[in-house]
Structures are given as structure tokens and as C-alpha cells.
Design a protein with these regions (language model features):
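Glycine/small-residue-rich loop that forms an oxyanion/phosphate-binding "nest" at active or ligand-binding sites
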Residues: 1-3
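Exported/periplasmic ABC-transporter solute-binding proteins
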Residues: 5-166
Length: 166
């Protein structure tokens, strides 16, 4: 979860999302269905784990507690927090890690399991894995590129940026 630097609302986890003073940013359920569904499934799973009724992200009626992105959530989420339209955004770990690295004076993050520098996601977290393959024979450089993507060097780079490889 991405939050404003200093955590002015004292958010510590999913249980705080039911507080009346907390506004949540989520990706758009109609235009970014994959990320939206992943985030909602993660929130639902984490809420069940914590025994919290967190029905508002999936309620039919618009809710003032939820600020939805309009186009590209990975650009809009940090902006919504800085603009004061949201207090917390559920985003992929690698995105929150990037925001805290490029804007360390603006953002903090709350991992949903483990620590920021050593995440241990709870089983309820939806985790996306990256896959690569060739179409046909991959052309002149396809197999070399696939070998490169499968190398230890690239795994280290992925890991540094909070990404997992299948």
C-alpha cells in the first residue's frame, strides 16, 4: 500500500481501510480490469484474514471512500495521494517501491506481509509473474534474447525492482 510520507493518517494495514477518515485509491474497474481485480481480490483476501468487513471496494453504488483512476492507475495513484484525494493506494509492490525510491520525500509504503526491503506476501496477495517466450523460431536474435531474459543478471535486476519471474 502506498501512503504519504510520514503516514499522517497512521495507516498500518488493511484493517485501517474501514475507518471513516481513510480514502482509498484503486485502478479503474472498467478500463484496467486486470489490476483492479487483482487489487480487490488481494483486499478481500486480506480483509478475510484480518476478519474485517471490507465490502466497499466491490459495492455497486459509488463510494466516497474510494477514488478510482480514470486512465492509467500507476500514474494516477501517487498523484491522488499528493493531491489529497486519497490517503492510501493499493498498487503492485514494484510500483510502490519505485515511487518511494524516486520520491523518497513524498511517499512511504506498507507491505502486505514481510518488510519493505524483504516482502513476504501473505497467501491472500495476488502476485503476478512475468513470462517470456518465442513466437515461431524467434528470428535471428530471439533465442539469444530469451537466454538473456532467463539469465541470473536479469533475475538480479528484476529482484532489485521488486519483480518476480516465473
Amino acid at each position: 500500500m502506498l501512503i504519504k510520507k510520514g503516514n499522517p493518517k497512521n495507516i498500518s494495514g488493511v484493517t485501517d481501510l474501514i475507518r471513516e477518515d481513510i480514502r482509498l485509491f484503486l485502478s479503474n474497474p472498467e478500463t484496467e480490469t486486470v489490476s483492479y481485480q487483482g487489487y480487490v481480490n488481494t483486499l478481500s483476501g486480506m480483509a478475510a484474514r484480518e476478519n474485517v468487513d471490507l465490502s466497499f471496494p466491490t459495492d455497486e453504488a459509488p463510494d466516497t471512500k474510494v477514488c478510482y483512476g480514470e486512465q492509467i492507475h500507476h500514474r494516477e495513484a501517487p498523484q491522488a495521494i499528493i493531491d489529497g484525494r486519497a490517503d492510501v493506494a493499493v498498487v503492485y509492490y514494484h510500483l510502490a517501491l519505485r515511487y518511494t525510491r524516486i520520491f523518497p520525500a513524498l511517499f512511504d509504503m506498507i507491505p502486505l506481509g514481510g518488510a519493505i526491503d524483504h516482502p513476504q506476501p501473505f497467501p491472500e496477495n495476488v502476485i503476478s509473474l512475468s513470462h517470456a517466450g518465442l513466437i515461431g523460431d524467434g528470428g535471428q536474435w530471439g533465442s539469444c534474447f530469451l537466454d538473456f531474459l532467463s539469465s541470473e543478471s536479469v533475475s538480479i535486476i528484476y529482484s532489485h525492482h521488486g519483480l518476480l519471474r516465473a
